[in-house]
Amino acid sequence: MSGKWISALLLLQISFCFKSGNCGKVLVWPMEYSHWMNIKIILEELVQKGHEVTVLRPSAFVFLDPKETSDLKFVTFPTSFSSHDLENFFTRFVNVWTYELPRDTCLSYFLYLQDTIDEYSDYCLTVCKEAVSNKQFMTKLQESKFDVVFSDAIGPCGELIAELLQIPFLYSLRFSPGYTIEQYIGGVLFPPSYVPMIFSGLAGQMTFIERVHNMICMLYFDFWFQTFREKKWDPFYSKTLGRPTTLAEIMGKAEMWLIRSYWDLEFPHPISPNVDYIGGLHCKPAKPLPKDIEDFVQSSGEHGVVVFSLGSMVRNMTEEKANIIAWALAQIPQKVLWRFDGKKPPTLGPNTRLYKWLPQNDLLGHPKTKAFVTHGGANGIYEAIHHGIPMIGIPLFAEQHDNIAHMVAKGAAVEVNFRTMSKSDLLNALEEVIDNPFYKKNAMWLSTIHHDQPTKPLDRAVFWIEFVMRHKGAKHLRSLGHNLPWYQYHSLDVIGFLLSCVAVTVVLALKCFLFVYRFFVKKEKKTKNE
């Protein structure tokens, strides 16, 4: 009997191969934390379709643990960093952004972050150098005959490995600062007149002053990106490939861009055919809760429950903040499930339970859930959108301020400032979102939009990877603008030529006019003299 089942599974896997073409070999250059959580879902689906997936992993890692999944093949290469060093860096990064950075404009706080961003760039550059300079490691990759490289664009190197292996590659990306990578490499347009820049904190229809702010942010990040790549990355790529090149030129060869967002969160803007928005690909129907959690949820009666989580990267909330939150939660009639890994606050109410981990998606999909208190991470926001749950946003770092600003603009959330938050601020926000049907109505509207797609985001992501493998690329979808220098892309040479033509025409017309004028004036004077 077991032999028949094994044969059936093998036949099923073979059928997947025939359905999508030949089973391929996918090489992956991933990133940590939520980046890995999202990309892993795509990789596991590829394995289910019969493809062989190999994940490149530095010896220093936080989330890239082979023990968590047996379906993926991991290849580890040595690095000079330790996992402890890496975790300390990310913890320091989160703490600086959460507690220290000014929040006035993107210019003020990003200047403070410059050293941290440079440190992250140096880490990525060192890891990349250690990977591509490892001859044994690169020879092994060459001999494996991979069909495609799937990389996270926020951590450069996957495209360099693809170039060295001479195979196509495609990107997964949530965002880059100021959308610089998407704009100048991916060819995605973000007109600052109506599209709020990431890290600007703006959303929706902008006023004149907000458009000025948005334009300044765009110009700043444009300049920042140029200096970011020109200082170290461009010389390294040129040296490695043995020819003059740039990071932007190599990244621009990406066949497809799979952006981990969607139009229920984003605001509309032009995109190219080789860009697809796959936000919420990790969302699934809610599963039954563990018995102890289900019993607690059911004990809430008609009032329902509130789910509270500020993510996996926040671990050292101050005692003062914890007490403010606990007191506010204690005042509402709902039961509260709070993901919190710290000392129990003295003000914690009997309606609130602390958990080091929560089945967040399953709780958000429970019919008794009334609201979700979130830091604004994209994964949590998409789970809330998926299940139609209104939010109280307490953004902490990175793009979370923008995510919550977008949800506020769409009427599905209320924002609370983490640094200045008082007991009454949080309590008022909770009562507003729970008691006002306006927020639930808009959350359900976004949920309807999210579910009403021709194909599921995960299926589209897998399709495009298989598409690139089947056709050895997708160059017919790439904009020809990738082949143009910046002055041609913006038609500055054409504008200059047309202006020159106008100028020459005007000059010739003036000269003709002056010639005619002088001719008749002289003739008239001559006639008078006679």
From Swiss-Prot:
The record's section on InterPro entries has: UDP-glycosyltransferase, UDP_glucos_trans, UDP_glycos_trans_CS
Q: Which domain of life is it from?
A: Eukaryota
* UniProt signal peptide: 1-23
Q: Name one GO cellular component term.
A: endoplasmic reticulum membrane
State what induces this protein.
By phenobarbital.
The record describes its membrane topology as: Single-pass membrane protein
GO terms, biological process = estrogen metabolic process; response to xenobiotic stimulus
- Does the record carry Phosphoprotein as a key word? no
Provide this UniProt record's keywords sorted from A to Z: Endoplasmic reticulum, Glycoprotein, Glycosyltransferase, Lipid metabolism, Membrane, Signal, Steroid metabolism, Transferase, Transmembrane, Transmembrane helix
| Catalytic activity of the protein | glucuronate acceptor + UDP-alpha-D-glucuronate = acceptor beta-D-glucuronoside + UDP + H(+); 17alpha-estradiol + UDP-alpha-D-glucuronate = 17alpha-estradiol 3-O-(beta-D-glucuronate) + UDP + H(+); 16alpha,17alpha-estriol + UDP-alpha-D-glucuronate = 16alpha,17alpha-estriol 3-O-(beta-D-glucuronate) + UDP + H(+); 17beta-hydroxy-5alpha-androstan-3-one + UDP-alpha-D-glucuronate = 5alpha-dihydrotestosterone 17-O-(beta-D-glucuronate) + UDP + H(+)
| Gene Ontology MF terms | glucuronosyltransferase activity
A Pfam family this chain is assigned to:
UDPGT
Where is the protein situated, by its record's location annotation? Endoplasmic reticulum membrane
PTM (free text): N-glycosylated.
Can you tell me where the transmembrane regions are? Answer: 494-510
Q: What is this protein called?
A: UDP-glucuronosyltransferase 2B15
The gene name on file is Ugt2b15
